[in-house]
Amino acid sequence: MTPKTIKVALIGNPNVGKTSVFNQLTGLNQQVGNYPGITVDKKTGITKLNQITKAKIIDLPGTYSLNANSIDENVVIELLLNKNDEDFPDVAVVVTEVENLKRNLLLFTQIKDLEIPTLLVIN
């Protein structure tokens, strides 16, 4: 069988735990902090799903919506709107926090509207 790599983008508001999820999935140790702006560029890591399938996990900067207000938010939008980007996701995982679930759902619905298969993770 041919090896396959699935691209999984971790997306969410700033400071909801995207990088913590990334570190758990990849075994890497990217810096985390209890304030926005820690991740300002996309980071990638690989995790093995089974004998022939790997997942390329893409940790993206925090954004509140797909209407960019900053350079790091623009990183998210440029990836999600460019199907020719080498990291265009097969699956988007929107990481949210239960305390601000309603605010986080705006981003979730915007990504769903792009017709990218999307999962919601409540951290």
What do these predicted ranges mean?
Residues M1-I71:
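Conserved G1/Walker A P-loop phosphate-binding module
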